[in-house]
Amino acid sequence: MSEENKVGGKMSNDVNPGLVPGVTELQARSAIADLLNHHSRALDRVDAVGLKAVYWPSATVDYGGFKGLAHDFADIVMGALAGQYELTQHRVSNTVFNFSSEVACSTESYVFAKHLLLDGQSEMVFSGRYLDQFEQRAGVWKMTFRRVVMDWSRRLAVTDERQGGSFAALTKGSNQKTDPSWTHLA
């Protein structure tokens, strides 16, 4: 967000997405992408502390059925995830960044989330977008707002192959603290 990357008062990526961003903008994009990844991991590992860590305490979310403080959502959603799904995977991609200043950014990201139901016989697949707002305070970026936009969702029957054939010997994932990523990333 240096002056050379601004066109008519807007950040360069708003009006010319091919313009190479400056170092400050690249650093901001990296921090924001890291937050998006940590948000997905927190949902998939049923980690309320990790989810709260990506939001400022005053942040709000709009998840359709829940509209309110993000930290309250973090406490509520973990029970819902653990009570309905054996495993989830939230994949975020195609993020578009819109910097309104050096300390404020709005993003649109595509989300593709798979949810293996507790019975192991079906999965719910969600495709949508996250409309997020981020702020940098004292050199730290965090989310201030998230709205989930649903493009489509479907439920599919699955055949669980985790214990069969060449998959039998693989380490199995979990949404609990027994997942190997907890010790791997410690």
Where are these regions (language model features)?
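Short beta-strand edge/turn micro-motifs at domain boundaries
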Residues: 2-10, 106, 127-161
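Short, conserved clusters of charged catalytic residues that mark active-site
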Residues: 34, 92, 129
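Outer-membrane beta-barrel transmembrane domain signature
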Residues: 123-125
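A solvent-exposed, acidic/Ser-Thr-rich amphipathic alpha-helical stretch
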Residues: 48-116
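Acidic/histidine-enriched, glycine/proline-rich intrinsically disordered or flexible terminal extensions
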Residues: 156-186
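Short, low-complexity N-terminal intrinsically disordered segments enriched in polar/charged residues
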Residues: 2-41, 45, 49, 53
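Flexible, membrane-facing loop/turn or short amphipathic-helix motifs
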Residues: 117-121
